[in-house]
Amino acid sequence: DRAAVKLHDIGLQLHRNGAGELGFRVFVGGGMGRTPFIAPVIREFIPVSQYLSYCEAILRVYNRYGRRDNIYKARIKILVHEIGAAEFTRQVETEWALLEPLALDAPAAEYERIKAQFAPPAYDASAPDSIDRSDPDFAVWVDHNIAAHKVPGYAIVTISLKPVGGIPGDASAEQMELIADLAAKYSFDEIRVTHSQNLVLADVRKDQLHALWSALNAADLATPNLDLVTDIIACPGLDYCALANARSIPVAQSIALRFANLDRQHDIGELKIKISGCINACGHHHAGHIGILGVDRKGEESYQLSLGGSGAEDTSLAKILGPGFSEEGVVDAVEKVIEAYRSLRLNPEERFLDAYRRVGAEPFKEAVYG
């Protein structure tokens, strides 16, 4: 799940029913921020042809019963939590029964028009389906930043915008110009932006990967760290945002520098660190394997550490580990958590998140607080 559908007001998950018809599983009432919730399913299947009117029914129920007495509780997730998923579902189904006959959904021609904009490019059926891995640095990048493609001879490339010590998700004008040129040359002129603050070239021939990597590497855009400890998501924080309580970027940079050694990163394995500078959770710290929240403690910047979050199919909300830390202290705490994980894991293949779920928070608390 690349869209964290269970952590939004309305989440739509495409799937097919028993008859093979395409539709959505509907989640409602998720969210992060001040009061995080995982959205429950309110309908297992709604056909694509009817999902707009169903979403309209959701919004009408919220408009009718949602809180207006408290700005912090004026959210769908609060209503679902207060009246319960079953009652909210009943209200939506009742409302939708009135709306569905009104033909509010888009006509089939509109869906076809939109679908045409996402038509697959002109793939070359003769593209070789192998990668020359003789260059060791290139091979490491392939192992970590390349994903399988459904078309033989092609690959999906993630361009990491997380060079060690850099600002997460940041790219210079020159780098963006280069990426645009490379997309035109190697990926049918298309660039996709991910929620993890990286870029994707979705349709690259395997026999052109080395040439692409060479160009990216020369521009410091070939860091092989996708989903590793230095692939950190961070909001702009106090450096740029008037809402923030603490800085996020320097913390991300310090953590990345602490774990700069690639062999160490690869040994740690998949680890998602997410940093928010305030309770609004723009950095998705609730969904981080390790989440960091910046708070104001009597005029001083402080950082709260949470563990065990996930925004994937196995959605979970990270739980606060204990008292907060200074900027330097939180980097030390993260390192202690990671070293505790390395000693606790059953084998190098056991991910941080799986180890945390197996042993719970206590061993990590002991490692951090003594």
Where are these regions (language model features)?
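Peripheral terminal and linker regions in Fe-S/redox and tRNA-modifying enzymes
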Residues: 1-370
